[in-house]
């Protein structure tokens, strides 16, 4: 007889109120085993010949609905579902539970003798081979579910996942650490706590955001990375806030003590950077506080050569989560091939460390977890660790959340949650083991709630007893985990008392030696760094030329589909018009076609493209059609996967209805794979401000703070077209306010060919010192405007132009109008109806860096110029006016009059009524074109 058993779903184990049905099914099973589901066959086979079970089942008839077996099943079900409420997971200050479900044998009118007469198989199908009876099995369950790890998994909908977790948790298993491993674990804790104690003593009051109280985080990370190494995962991406960050840097990424202590002493830490190049640390010219900085360590300390990255992070809690997910996905994707990328979730894994107050408090966590199983964003399962010190600055849980646990919000994503006592180090290791096994099996997220405390205040200058006096009376008396575990090992005979204290002192000795080296080092005379020379210049134009035949070959390939592929007739007519620029003299390339041609040539150059956003496959305004759908079968076809001589991948995904997490993901992806042309497209530019934290704290400042380069491109539909205040403005002014030190390029274009050349220039800058973010105020109605569309000869040569003008007679021009984007096109079309040679329209295609030299050179050619006007659609306090005014004021000096035409100052971006919009828009154009 074999001991192998098939998985049993949760339902048969928890039949409870369905007991009558189960009895009927059992009778059917006795007549014909194949007449019941397979999982019930397994369960019923364990009790078929058991004299204690069958009579017990039969005794629970409709006349005795509260019979013995039903009560046993209710007890078992309660232990599984609610045992966590009585688990030993609080090192100090356990909460007082007001309402705890029945969890004891006596609560169900059961006793030892009754349970000893029932098969263990009724508790769990695999227990029949392990325990003699239900009493022994229930004792095991009580110990398991009420121990130092509290398990929550019954909320998971997937039967297979629930069954796997049930079996893994309930099967007798204990992390077996031999004496050497226990000794090593103690040493890890001694280093963790010794580091904190040394800093606390020698740098009194200095902010370090101590890990003390959740010290086990470091051995948990070390265990995770070791398991990952055994699985062949060679890229680890970690994201965390400031709490415990310095300890993780020193003991997980192996940043030398000398470097860390140097930062406290304001000396140059780079003098102690390992010469072997194994530790990569970047820095910007303005810098950041030490507990925001990350790094990358290449090491074989965990069993195989691995790349361990800790992401740079601002003080904005949790916002790094999607960045880490994006970095992980980039490490998993193979983009150096034609077609779509292939994703290997085995290449890399993300570890995201949260705070207990911030995890339920910050919505970015829910946006990020929602990405977990999506085709374009999945990373094969993230390990989430909550460093739960049960306080947020001064705020206690009762004021921080509306749920029992900070992790309750994760239940909606069908992931297992393990709460573990931070003082039981061996239990924390077991929690990691189970989590990593589950991730490997199901490629899904796991949440571990590391329940501890905070030894000191929010920072080391803070006095927590002012606001939290009672908890801190107990915390001050509570022994550290280093001491708790050390004494346990002494009692077990693993180490002696002298060995314990000797090793603690050895750690302090190593830290003193490191400190002594720094005392001899020179103070930093000038800590300021200079910007890279490449950033002194704007984005450089890509001057590569193309033959007509080359672009035609690409265009033909993009308009060729598989045999039998049925495109909607209405759409096919639109796509067929893309042949016209190549076979008609008056054929023009519109915006969407210009983009397709640019993308194709970029792919031929070997640069992968990733484009995401809400509705990006089709395009919000039904212009792109990058992914085609067979109208009969629903199958899809992506022409940009089939470009002739394609050397890199094209990846496009409709994103979930999220901005912050999706933009953070794309930023992280591009930081990890700097060769990738990452583009995020807003559904409307108005919604981009949902990602403001990513813009402010990462995209536009990361290089200045951290030396972290990104070339992420933003497509933000922007134009005033009578659609109201929430569908008109991408808040151009905010991006221009963020622009400084050549940290980005901001454009608002009026020409499809200039768009083509811009995209190529941005792609060419990637993975170079030139790379920087690109912000495109992309068009809406202009997508189909013939004035914007250009002939093919403007694509075969030339490059991006920061300003554009029409032909003009210099001596006749008395007025220059500077405008951008749709405003320029509106003015151009109005002027075409009433030509006036005295007015010269100038399209400012690139707003930042502002094209001063180009405008100055143009104005110098106009001998009779009298007036320069800036014209915009936006209100005066918005748009580009306040940004361009200082530049233009210098250019006109006292030589010309300077005027503004646009909407007056407004609190909201645009009018809500379409007719009023037209009146205001027409008035702006009329006044601007008047020649005084």
From Swiss-Prot:
Q: What is its EC number?
A: 1.2.4.2
Task: Note whether Oxidoreductase occurs among the keywords.
Answer: yes
A Gene Ontology term for the protein's cellular component: oxoglutarate dehydrogenase complex
Q: Which UniProt keywords apply?
A: Glycolysis, Oxidoreductase, Thiamine pyrophosphate
Entry keyword annotation includes Oxidoreductase:
yes
Which reaction(s) does the protein catalyse, per the Swiss-Prot or TrEMBL entry?
N(6)-[(R)-lipoyl]-L-lysyl-[protein] + 2-oxoglutarate + H(+) = N(6)-[(R)-S(8)-succinyldihydrolipoyl]-L-lysyl-[protein] + CO2
**Gene Ontology biological process terms in this record:** glycolytic process; tricarboxylic acid cycle
Alphabetical list of InterPro entries matching this protein: 2oxoglutarate_DH_E1 (IPR011603), 2oxoglutarate_DH_E1_bac (IPR023784), DH_E1 (IPR001017), KGD_C_sf (IPR042179), ODO-1/KGD_C (IPR031717), THDP-binding (IPR029061), Transketolase-like_Pyr-bd (IPR005475)
Name what cofactor the protein needs: thiamine diphosphate
Organism domain of life: Bacteria
Q: Name one GO molecular function term.
A: thiamine pyrophosphate binding
Q: Give the function comment from the record.
A: E1 component of the 2-oxoglutarate dehydrogenase (OGDH) complex which catalyzes the decarboxylation of 2-oxoglutarate, the first step in the conversion of 2-oxoglutarate to succinyl-CoA and CO(2).
Similarity comment: Belongs to the alpha-ketoglutarate dehydrogenase family.
Q: PANTHER family, per this entry? A: 2-OXOADIPATE DEHYDROGENASE COMPLEX COMPONENT E1 (PTHR23152:SF4), 2-OXOGLUTARATE DEHYDROGENASE (PTHR23152)
What quaternary arrangement does the UniProt entry report? Homodimer. Part of the 2-oxoglutarate dehydrogenase (OGDH) complex composed of E1 (2-oxoglutarate dehydrogenase), E2 (dihydrolipoamide succinyltransferase) and E3 (dihydrolipoamide dehydrogenase); the complex contains multiple copies of the three enzymatic components (E1, E2 and E3).
- List the protein's name: 2-oxoglutarate dehydrogenase E1 component
| Gene, per the UniProt record | odhA
């Amino acid at each position: 007889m074999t001991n192998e058993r098939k998985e049993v779903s949760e339902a048969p184990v928890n039949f409870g109120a369905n007991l009558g049905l189960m009895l009927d099914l059992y009778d059917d099973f006795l007549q014909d085993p194949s007449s019941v589901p397979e999982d019930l066959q397994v369960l019923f086979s364990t009790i078929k010949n058991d004299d204690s079970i069958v009579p017990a089942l039969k005794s629970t008839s409709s006349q005795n609905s509260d019979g013995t077996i039903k009560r046993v099943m209710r007890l078992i079900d309660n232990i599984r579902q609610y045992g966590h409420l009585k688990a030993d997971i609080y090192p100090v200050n356990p909460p007082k539970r007001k309402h705890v479900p029945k969890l004891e044998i006596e609560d169900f009118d059961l006793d030892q003798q009754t349970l000893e007469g029932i098969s263990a198989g009724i508790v769990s199908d695999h227990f029949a081979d392990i325990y003699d009876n239900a009493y022994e099995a229930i004792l095991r369950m009580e110990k398991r579910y009420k121990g130092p790890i509290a398990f929550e998994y019954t909320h998971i909908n997937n039967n297979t996942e629930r069954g796997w977790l049930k079996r893994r948790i309930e099967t007798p298993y204990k992390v077996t650490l031999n004496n050497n491993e226990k000794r090593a674990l103690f040493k890890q804790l001694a280093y963790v706590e010794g580091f904190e104690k040394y800093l606390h003593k020698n740098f009194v009051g200095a902010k370090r955001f101590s890990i003390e109280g959740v010290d086990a985080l470091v051995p948990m990370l070390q265990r995770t990375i070791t398991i990952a190494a055994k699985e062949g995962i060679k890229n680890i991406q970690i994201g965390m806030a400031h709490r415990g960050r310095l300890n993780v840097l020193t003991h997980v990424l192996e940043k030398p003590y000398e470097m860390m202590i140097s930062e406290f002493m304001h000396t140059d830490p780079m003098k102690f950077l390992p010469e072997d190049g194994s530790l990569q640390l970047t820095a910007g010219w303005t810098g950041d506080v030490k507990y925001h900085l990350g790094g990358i360590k290449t090491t074989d300390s965990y069993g195989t050569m691995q790349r361990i990255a800790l992401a740079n992070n601002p003080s904005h809690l949790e916002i790094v989560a999607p960045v880490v997910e994006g970095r992980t996905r980039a490490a998993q994707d193979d983009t150096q091939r034609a077609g779509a990328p292939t994703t290997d979730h085995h290449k890399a894994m993300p570890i995201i460390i949260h705070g207990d107050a911030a995890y339920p408090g910050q919505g970015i966590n829910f946006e990020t977890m929602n990405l977990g199983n999506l085709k374009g964003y999945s990373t094969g399962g993230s390990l989430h660790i909550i460093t739960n010190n049960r306080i947020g600055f001064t705020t206690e849980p009762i004021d921080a959340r509306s749920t029992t646990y900070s992790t309750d919000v994760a239940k909606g994503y069908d992931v297992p949650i393990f709460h573990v006592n931070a003082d039981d180090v061996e239990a924390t290791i077991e929690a990691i083991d189970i989590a990593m096994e589950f991730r490997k099996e199901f490629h899904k997220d796991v949440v571990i709630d590391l329940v501890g405390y905070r030894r000191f205040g929010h920072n080391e200058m803070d006095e927590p007893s002012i606001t939290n006096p009672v908890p801190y009376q107990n915390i001050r008396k509570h022994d550290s985990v280093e001491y708790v575990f050390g004494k346990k090992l002494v009692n077990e005979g693993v180490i002696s008392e002298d060995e314990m204290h000797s090793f603690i002192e050895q750690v302090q000795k190593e830290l003193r030696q490191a400190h002594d080296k720094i005392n001899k080092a020179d103070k930093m005379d000038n800590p300021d760094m200079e910007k890279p020379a490449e950033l002194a210049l704007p984005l450089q134009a890509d001057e590569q030329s193309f033959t007509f035949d080359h672009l035609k070959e690409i265009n033909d390939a993009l308009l060729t589909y598989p045999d039998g592929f049925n495109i909607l007739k209405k759409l096919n007519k639109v796509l067929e018009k893309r042949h016209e620029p190549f076979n008609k003299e008056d054929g023009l390339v519109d915006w969407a076609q210009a983009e397709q041609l640019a993308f194709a040539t970029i792919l031929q150059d070997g640069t992968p493209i990733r484009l995401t956003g809400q509705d990006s496959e089709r395009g919000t305004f039904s212009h792109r059609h990058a992914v085609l759908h067979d109208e009969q079968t629903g199958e899809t076809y992506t022409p940009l996967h089939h470009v002739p001589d394609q050397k890199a991948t094209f990846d496009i995904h409709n994103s979930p209805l999220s901005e912050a997490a999706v933009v953070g993901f794309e930023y992280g992806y591009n930081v990890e794979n700097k060769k990738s042309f990452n583009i995020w497209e807003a559904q409307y530019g108005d919604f981009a401000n949902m990602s403001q934290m990513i813009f402010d704290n990462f995209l536009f400042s990361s290089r200045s703070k951290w030396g972290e380069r990104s070339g992420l491109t933003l497509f933000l539909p922007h134009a005033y077209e009578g659609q109201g205040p929430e569908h008109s403005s991408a808040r151009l002014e905010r991006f221009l306010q963020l622009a400084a030190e050549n940290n980005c390029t901001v454009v608002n274009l009026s020409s499809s060919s200039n768009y083509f050349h811009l995209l190529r220039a941005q792609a060419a800058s990637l993975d170079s010192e030139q790379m920087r973010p690109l912000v495109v105020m992309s068009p809406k109605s202009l997508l189909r405007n013939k004035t914007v569309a250009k002939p093919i000869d403007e694509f075969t040569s030339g490059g991006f132009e920061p300003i554009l003008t029409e032909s003009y007679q210099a001596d006749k021009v008395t007025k220059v109008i500077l405008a951008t984007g749709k405003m320029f096109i509106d003015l151009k079309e109005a002027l075409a109806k009433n030509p006036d040679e005295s007015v010269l329209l100038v399209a400012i295609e690139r707003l930042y860096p502002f094209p001063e030299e180009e405008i100055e050179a143009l104005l110098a050619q106009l001998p009779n110029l009298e007036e320069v006007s800036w014209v915009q659609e936006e209100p005066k306090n918005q748009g580009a006016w306040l940004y361009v005014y200082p530049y233009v004021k210098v250019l006109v000096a006292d030589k010309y009059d300077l005027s503004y035409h646009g909407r007056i100052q407004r609190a909201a971006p645009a009018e809500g009524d379409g007719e009023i919009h037209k009146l205001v828009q027409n008035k702006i154009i009329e006044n601007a074109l008047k020649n005084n």
